[in-house]
Amino acid sequence: MSKIKQVIAREVLDSRGFPTVEADVILTSGVMGRAAVPSGASTGSHEAVELRDGGARYMGKGVLKAVANVNKIAKKITGMEASDIRLIDDTMIALDGTPNKGKFGANAILAVSMAVLRAGAADKKMPLYDYIRKIYAIKEKNYLLPVPMLNIINGGKHADSGLDVQEFMIVPNVSKSFKEGLREATEVYHTLKGILKAKGMVTAVGDEGGFAPHITKHEDVLKTIMDACKKAGHSQIKLALDCAASEFYKNGKYTFEKKQVSSKDMTKVYSSWVKKYPIVSIEDPLHEDDWDGWLHITKELGKKIRLVGDDLFVTNPERLEEGIEKKTANAILIKLNQIGSVSETIDVINMAHKAGYACVISHRSGETEDAFIADLAVATNAGAIKTGAPCRSERNAKYNRLLQIEQELGKKASYAKTKVFKK
């Protein structure tokens, strides 16, 4: 296997126009791997540190410090075998020396981690998903193409729509293939645009490509999406929510539709929606540290739908272990930059699978054209992926990569569909 010859980093722009870190890893064979990391808007307080420069430049969001830190990392990993990804990741983590990557920044470490894997795959002339599976000894016989969870109406921190809930998603979980599922969901998306226009509503899109109409009642959104599914001829499509409830929680209460309510009140709201609408998944329905509330909602809804922990778990093994012990939630959202290295991410996925928790591979609201997570989803047989609406190139880059993978694998792969979501 070739060794690392050179590591180069630079500041590039993400989909929101703010800087992020891109890294190139060049091997002695001459091949190169390149990766750019994403950035979140609504972030869990337990996430690894995304190092920013501060000051006036780019409104304080520059990443020149993180870029400079990649140069420090380069001195330690140059000469290492590209296939020794765990050793490389461990070396970077040890070099940082903090529990949350606060010294070098998760954005610096992750960019290198991803780029090393890309370089290794190129060196072996293997697709990235195959290489990830081999290098981490992932014991899966077949390949699953993930069910896409498409965020078609944005609220919360992703838009100025006035909605508390951050994402309203559609889930084509009974389609014949990924290709067909994406087509059906895309037809619903465009039908929804027509419905909103007919009602005189704005069809501008939010950070993740979903529409951001000024609707104040959440049930009105659910009804409108159901109308779009029916009108598009795809009434079999299911719904999912990302509530990002930590964003509307303060002093033990949730400010929901301009009322102060408790976690039990919120659970009643969600339960009523699950009865009325074909909702198969709710992400972050409660605050990230509201363990009692999470336990209650898991007892109420855990056998009916997916309850996905994002801010609750932040792709962190210690947080996930606590959730497993407390029997809270039944699924975890996987975001590479929450933990800050690919090796640690794989370990969390393995832990979740072993405990019977479902995994959803996810983008961030501040994305790049890098489609690494598409390969990650297929490599790990996660079965589900969240990467926005079928709009904006940084979102479609992931969907297009999955279309390529589905074609490459042919009969070796199947679409996850009802194996993953049941309702």
UniProtKB/Swiss-Prot annotation:
Disulfide bonds: none
Database matches in Pfam families: Enolase_C (PF00113), Enolase_N (PF03952)
Pathway noted in the entry: Carbohydrate degradation; glycolysis; pyruvate from D-glyceraldehyde 3-phosphate: step 4/5
Localization in the cell: Cytoplasm; Secreted; Cell surface
InterPro entries: Enolase, Enolase-like_C_sf, Enolase-like_N, Enolase_C, Enolase_CS, Enolase_N
UniProt-annotated binding residues for Mg(2+): D242, E283, D310
GO MF terms, alphabetically ordered: magnesium ion binding; phosphopyruvate hydratase activity
UniProt-listed PANTHER family: ENOLASE
Role: Catalyzes the reversible conversion of 2-phosphoglycerate (2-PG) into phosphoenolpyruvate (PEP). It is essential for the degradation of carbohydrates via glycolysis.
HAMAP family: Enolase
Name of the molecule in the record: Enolase
Organism of this sequence: Elusimicrobium minutum (strain Pei191)
